[in-house]
Amino acid sequence: MNRARFAGAVAVALITSPASAEDLFDLKPVADGVYAALARPATPINCNAAVVVYDEGVLVVDTHSRPSSARGLIQQIRGVTDKPVRYAVNTHFHWDHAQGNHAYPVAFPKQVAIVASEATRENLKELGMQRVKDQLEAGPRQIAALKERIAAATDATARKAIEGELAQQEAYLAEIRSLELTLPDLTFDKSLILHRQDRDIVLLFLGRGHTSGDVVAYLPKQRVVATGDLLHGWMPFMGDSYPPEWVATLDALDKLDFDHIVGGHGGVKPKSHLRFFRDYLADLIEAVRAARARGETLDQAKTSVAAVLKPKFDAGMDGRFDGSVGANIEKVYRDLEAKKY
């Protein structure tokens, strides 16, 4: 599709699917038939999704934190196309990317496949429900803390905002009490190529990184990648990660020819963001190694390493550097302490 035709299609899509205050996502056209469903702020968070409309149907990358969020996106997709969702891809097993799986076979019975790497299916099978149980245990404490904040709030606007968070947290907890965790029913080892009439959709496992099973969806003709939390616009969560391998996996991703990144969080990014994100991880590992070589304790390393990284990376992390860098330093420090790499 030439640029003029694509611009016209975008205009039609925006006219036929206006955003509303109730929408959970902002659908942003990225390329011909490719949309970024950017998650609006919510408690708990949702991830972004990529929506690919092809000749016979729709492919969605990631299913969010709960079925109601997935249903919300399905409704928004119906404002763009009446084609059914044929594939829902889990980029990895984390709760905010896969707990909405069940909504898709309910909405599209016998029509949709849930797709993931073999490692992600195994992670969901082994760890998914335990993560749900962890959330059920933590939920009442989070609700109690929000109620304390409401009681202590002196500003009416702030109180109203916290009350909104409380309502969302209570609704989330009620929903996941009866959550059915639907496992992927189509898996692959290294790659799966969907040859559609109007495009190829290439699903790739390039190596371990954010988790042991991260999947990338690559659209070579449209020059777009959807990357989940392997690569996104926020500071990385590293709790289940393999840091040196993550750098190598991003180097492999860098070899693909694309212009646009639809990551699991934050906005749509240009390809240049890959190098920025990759360098953060590489510099983090190097700086923690140096701190340990100087004999620094973990607390000392948190201070010194953050000071090294902040000037280069703070501005590109969507205001989340200070809140996450300490946990990232601790992850690498503990891994090095355990001689994992």
State where each predicted segment sits.
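Active-site neighborhood of phospho(di)ester-bond hydrolases with catalytic His/Asp-centered motifs
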Residues: V61-T63, R86-H94, V115-E118, L206, ...
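Bacterial N-terminal signal peptides
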Residues: A7-S17
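Conserved beta-strand hairpin/beta-sheet module of binuclear metal-dependent hydrolase folds
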Residues: K28-G79, V215-D229
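Active-site HxH/HxHxD metal-binding segment of metal-dependent hydrolases
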Residues: R78-P184, I193
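Core dinuclear metal-dependent hydrolase active-site scaffold
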Residues: P29, R177-L183, T187-L219
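C-terminal regulatory/interaction regions
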Residues: A293-Y341
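Active-site-proximal loop/helix segments of hydrolase catalytic cores
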Residues: D200-L256
